[in-house]
Amino acid sequence: MGLPEERVRSGSGSRGQEEAGAGGRARSWSPPPEVSRSAHVPSLQRYRELHRRSVEEPREFWGDIAKEFYWKTPCPGPFLRYNFDVTKGKIFIEWMKGATTNICYNVLDRNVHEKKLGDKVAFYWEGNEPGETTQITYHQLLVQVCQFSNVLRKQGIQKGDRVAIYMPMIPELVVAMLACARIGALHSIVFAGFSSESLCERILDSSCSLLITTDAFYRGEKLVNLKELADEALQKCQEKGFPVRCCIVVKHLGRAELGMGDSTSQSPPIKRSCPDVQISWNQGIDLWWHELMQEAGDECEPEWCDAEDPLFILYTSGSTGKPKGVVHTVGGYMLYVATTFKYVFDFHAEDVFWCTADIGWITGHSYVTYGPLANGATSVLFEGIPTYPDVNRLWSIVDKYKVTKFYTAPTAIRLLMKFGDEPVTKHSRASLQVLGTVGEPINPEAWLWYHRVVGAQRCPIVDTFWQTETGGHMLTPLPGATPMKPGSATFPFFGVAPAILNESGEELEGEAEGYLVFKQPWPGIMRTVYGNHERFETTYFKKFPGYYVTGDGCQRDQDGYYWITGRIDDMLNVSGHLLSTAEVESALVEHEAVAEAAVVGHPHPVKGECLYCFVTLCDGHTFSPKLTEELKKQIREKIGPIATPDYIQNAPGLPKTRSGKIMRRVLRKIAQNDHDLGDMSTVADPSVISHLFSHRCLTIQ
């Protein structure tokens, strides 16, 4: 497995680009010697030794790492028990069951009291507007988390209760999630870009007792009245027979009138006035965050939890359309995110880390909040977007805080590539040491630009493959050890045993392409789908008994490098966010004009993939630009702006098999104007296809 070290060469600007573009996968880049010298894992040989031990002796490997954390009581029985084979009984995974700990205690109290990091900055907060900044130390964060833990307890929240959080990227979001963890309640964070319908659905699915939200926030130029959306969601919950008893509201846009701007422990006042924001108030349900915090004590004993107690629920799109509540547990998740953060980003105490992901996604949970804090890191917490107020924003923040490790999505890289090198190169970026990508496979052109322009050919790139379900990185380079190939996630992380299977479930050796699966558990694996263990078993373990099935296709090359080829199921990856085709289709057919809908992915130069929708109209309705806009609006309201389609085509008929199944592979070909359709023997009405080709939308590649 892997490349002989002597065959590996460093990249050399444009020549490297040409070779990567034409020669493709043979090209590789060695880790810079100055990175390897100080790295936790300094060579490919050392990586292989550690990986072999982690897979062959997982109990000993992770047992040693567990000793670095505080346990109220040790593990009384087996360190690991599991079953991955549905034919042998119920699927279960148990790491350190019976041991008790608290993740909030481990990431805050220990750093403040044992490691004496109380005065170290935990987060530099950078607001939407440049100049709108604050910072919060580990001690200040601990005090605020204890205060809000007491607030939650006073509201009757107990261990095992679920709390919904619907907030922008502000320090109170981190405080809220850690307070839940401190008292043993499960946080269910809903991305603030999701609609009220999506929020309602998630509150109902996990029966959340309480909602935490914000008055409003700006995303670039756009004002988002989050409280209004939260009110709509709570009204929908009430109508469906589930009244949420309490909603705690952070006054974010109204901070100036609270006089909170000078305190380092609070986010500062917004610089842009919002006289037009009307915040409705529901007496008896709504409570102001700042008023509750003023009355709360600043000490709070943590709730000691079993390692296998649930820590949080995070919803991810499911191929059936209904989102799945992914459940992660206290002990295993803590070990895994702390360890992946330390090794994948080669973290050292003086680093300033910046993950641009929103905490509403798993990347934000693992690598904005829990992973960095578990390592005592200083991070940047960014509320804004890469292009506001201009395309210099990310690089000016890198220079401002002297960011050393930078983690973002290929979508952001492709977006910024469009504006050329100058907005990047006019900033120093001298502090950068490691670059990372997450959310989707990165195309080689974007990788090369990231390496050459952003990293000035001196920063290793960690191209990380993982999922909401895995908790942390699964396939990834290590900065000081792994020769990089543009577009490859390279090799498995510690404890990860990948395999590639064919359709019959046989493991393929050497160069191969097929289904990516994992053969044994790692501590960060999800334990169940909330309230639906059967769905957990069916989705991830039924197709190939004995394996965790990712749903992704994968190639392994002659050097043993893994290349993710994309989703095999009916899922789309838009700007690094997984969307279900079924979810979008059902939002379309809810419109009175639409009889039937089919949604496929289409290549997009910035998003990676975008939505191309085919709609069959009901009798009496005509296709028009007005209808197209109505359908887009409907999807935004039902799911959120992230799911807005780029293309909607009128389809008087859809290609179907004789049994009535929509042939989505044919629709994908039509969307891309690719007439090489393959075997069409099962199509019921071939004339439908020629009509769709002749009326397809004009697309960009």
Swiss-Prot record:
Gene3D superfamilies: 3.30.300.30, N-terminal domain of ligase-like (3.40.50.12780). GO terms for molecular function: acetate-CoA ligase activity; AMP binding; ATP binding; chromatin binding; propionate-CoA ligase activity; transcription coactivator activity. It catalyses: acetate + ATP + CoA = acetyl-CoA + AMP + diphosphate; propanoate + ATP + CoA = propanoyl-CoA + AMP + diphosphate. Its main location: cytoplasm. Residues 1-41 are annotated as: Disordered. GO terms for cellular component: cytoplasm; cytosol; mitochondrial matrix; nucleus. Residues 1-107 are annotated as: Interaction with TFEB. The modification Phosphoserine is found at S28, S30, S36, S263, S265, S267, S659. The keyword Metal-binding does not apply. GO terms for biological process: acetate biosynthetic process; acetyl-CoA biosynthetic process; acetyl-CoA biosynthetic process from acetate; ethanol catabolic process; lipid biosynthetic process; long-term memory; propionate biosynthetic process. Keywords: Acetylation, Activator, ATP-binding, Cytoplasm, Ligase, Lipid metabolism, Nucleotide-binding, Nucleus, Phosphoprotein, Transcription, Transcription regulation. Changing T363A: Loss of catalytic activity but no effect on its nuclear translocation upon glucose deprivation. Loss of ability to promote gene transcription for lysosomal biogenesis and autophagy. InterPro entries: Ac_CoA_lig, ACAS_N, AMP-bd_C, AMP-bd_C_sf, AMP-binding_CS, AMP-dep_synth/lig_dom, ANL_N_sf. CoA binds at R219, G220, E221, K222, T363, S575, R636. The modification N6-acetyllysine is found at K418, K661. It is found in: Cytoplasm, Cytosol; Cytoplasm; Nucleus. It is an enzyme of class 6 (ligase). A motif (Nuclear localization signal) lies at residues 656-668. Catalyzes the synthesis of acetyl-CoA from short-chain fatty acids. Acetate is the preferred substrate. Can also utilize propionate with a much lower affinity. Nuclear ACSS2 promotes glucose deprivation-induced lysosomal biogenesis and autophagy, tumor cell survival and brain tumorigenesis. Glucose deprivation results in AMPK-mediated phosphorylation of ACSS2 leading to its translocation to the nucleus where it binds to TFEB and locally produces acetyl-CoA for histone acetylation in the promoter regions of TFEB target genes thereby activating their transcription. Monomer. Interacts with TFEB. AMPK-mediated phosphorylated form at Ser-659 interacts with KPNA1; this interaction results in nuclear translocation of ACSS2. Interacts with the 'Thr-172' phosphorylated form of PRKAA2. Interacts with CREBBP. This is Acetyl-coenzyme A synthetase, cytoplasmic. It comes from Homo sapiens.
